[in-house]
Amino acid sequence: MDDERDVGYKPLISIHQRLADNNGVNIGLQINQAINRLRGDLLPPEWITERLATYEQPVQEKEELHRILTQHHVLVLHAPDHPGRYTAALAALHRKVGDNIRHVRREPGEAFSAEGLEDHKTGWILDLRDEGNRLPSGVGPALLEDAPHLADCGSYLAVLAATEPWRHASKGTDRLAHRLPLPPPEEVLRAHLERTPPPVKSDRWIGASEVTAGIKDGPPAKVARWAEAIREAECLDLKKEKPFKDLVHEVVQAVEDWRAELLDWHTRHEDSAHRNYLLAAAVLNGAPVETVYGAADTLAQALGESPPPRHGQQGLGVIALTDAIDAYVTDDDTLRFRRIGYGEAVVDYFWADRPHLIKRFTHWTADQTGNKDLPDDVANQLADRVTTWALQYMRAKHGRRATQLLRDIAGQWSTSLPEQARDLLTVAAVDTGTGRRVRDAYLAWARRSDRDVPPRLKTALARACERLADVYPTMMLLRLTELAAHTEDEDVTDAVGHALTVLWDQPTSRSEIQDQLDDWSRSPEAGRRTAAHHAFLHLAARTTEDGRPVLLVAAHEDKSQAWQTARWRDLLLHYRTLPGPLLQQALNAWMNAAASLPDLQEPVLTILQHAVYQSQTDTVYAADRYLALSHLLFAWAPVQSLHPPSEQEVLRDRLLLALRQADPAVPAPDGHVLGS
């Protein structure tokens, strides 16, 4: 998901790829790669090899980075924009520790100390680019203090940052840092063309004035795009039939997204029949031509048109329309474009030209994935291609329109393509170019009512947060709890509860969840307090297969019991403002466990009793909490006067008796008081 496409960036499958045959990409693999990287897994050796294969670095610079790492075990690589910091760090660390390289697991804005990096002889990458201009002022001295620990472990740390924030945060530690200049674009282009299979002879391309003008002063990401377009042009002209100047022209147009050509084409073809056929062909590139022909009509209807029925030979046929869009029909009657990345450029043009129709268009594309006339490969890849287009659009746009597009697509897919909706929301949140804006948008959506944000979209968002919690636990916990606090929909509630349970099931996350909910419950902000109550309520209502509440996995630990007591106390205190059915479900789960699992009876009863009153700490007996728990208990085990007391009734009365005996205003009768 790293959109800093520098000289060495060539992932196994890239969401930036625009292949000549528009086969799309595997977004699921991209998500797994990004999450594995962000959570600190070892970077795959083959991925490192691929990334470094085209990396070209001046010898003097290479030695300078090696010197800083050798002397300090910490290297800060900073630059104003995108000159290849990531690959430079990867290369410097690889020289020191080989393939034993990991990312530092850290949420944006979270405090960092290298003392938590315990692995020996490991190269660590700490990516602070997502912090923007918000680097803490003492980062430089803190890194210098961490250097001895890294040296003791035989490990090395490479930090990636922007130049201006680093300048303010370095505080006299510039000896750790190196400002990375832009590499010569011609050498970047040569490396990409000659070292990536299939290799392309670079001399004639570097000698073309249009190419050198296009890459001049360009960051590696831009040069890599030129190399990609050149390789595609060569692949489309295997027979060497096109004059070289025509190939150069196509490459220039492709890098510019065919915008000038498409503007001219749309000016000459004002009728929607041509335009809809072009857009349908772009989306369904590789589909049977008759399927594209029919899809153009359904697209017209989806966009609000009323195309007249074509009887017999009325209107243009597939030959004329296909020729008009500069495509061709293959021997197996499928439609293909002749130009590099043309299909994707057509969609980009439509989104820029008709933003008010994006919602209708994405609804139509979602419908096409179920088109029985589409070959499986085209249908299966369509959602991935739309995801790719959406990410490219969002990287280019920085206003509300970008996240609105994401919401529109995910909202459409959440009904018919829920898995793809979850994938889209996940990949957008871990993409370097869109992630921070998108994660902020998710928090805003989570705080909206079911009327403002449809429950199906909230369900997809909860499921995306569940996946993202693996790398952003605190951040996703907040979004999940806000979702819980602003919905009345059962599906959303269930998705949130499941996500919170998955998060709780990670032993390393439990203490973080406890601390976070503690902080939120004491927050002066009412919204944070409400979020804490809802988060605990959802967790309290979840059980294992044998009926054991998930929160009672560590019920015999004093800290856990104290934490659960405090959280149950909050629930009873806010009894009237919480979702009644869910609160009753949680109480039922705990009391059922107390009744059926002997090892849980004492912990459950003690926690619930102390949630009402604890003599060691409470100076006043809280009657409101007693009444709330009493109401819940009688709903769990109603009075059945015509029958002998059930086991549930006996347990209910035992707890209520203990609570009455604990009331300091009531003379204590003889007998045992539970938990005293």
Region spans (language model):
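Long, low-complexity intrinsically disordered regions enriched in small/polar
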Residues: 1-43, 490
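N-terminal pre-Walker A segment at the start of P-loop NTPase domains
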Residues: 37-66
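Walker A/P-loop nucleotide-binding motif
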Residues: 72-88
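P-loop NTPase Walker A phosphate-binding motif
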Residues: 85-101, 256
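Conserved P-loop NTPase "ATPase switch" module shared by AAA+ and STAND
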Residues: 98-156, 161-162
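Amphipathic alpha-helical "lid/sensor" segments that cap RecA-like P-loop NTPase cores
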Residues: 168-172, 188-255
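C-terminal leucine-rich, beta-strand-based interaction scaffolds used for sensing/assembly
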Residues: 257-264, 269, 284-420, 439
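Extended amphipathic alpha-helical coiled-coil/heptad-repeat regions
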Residues: 374-575
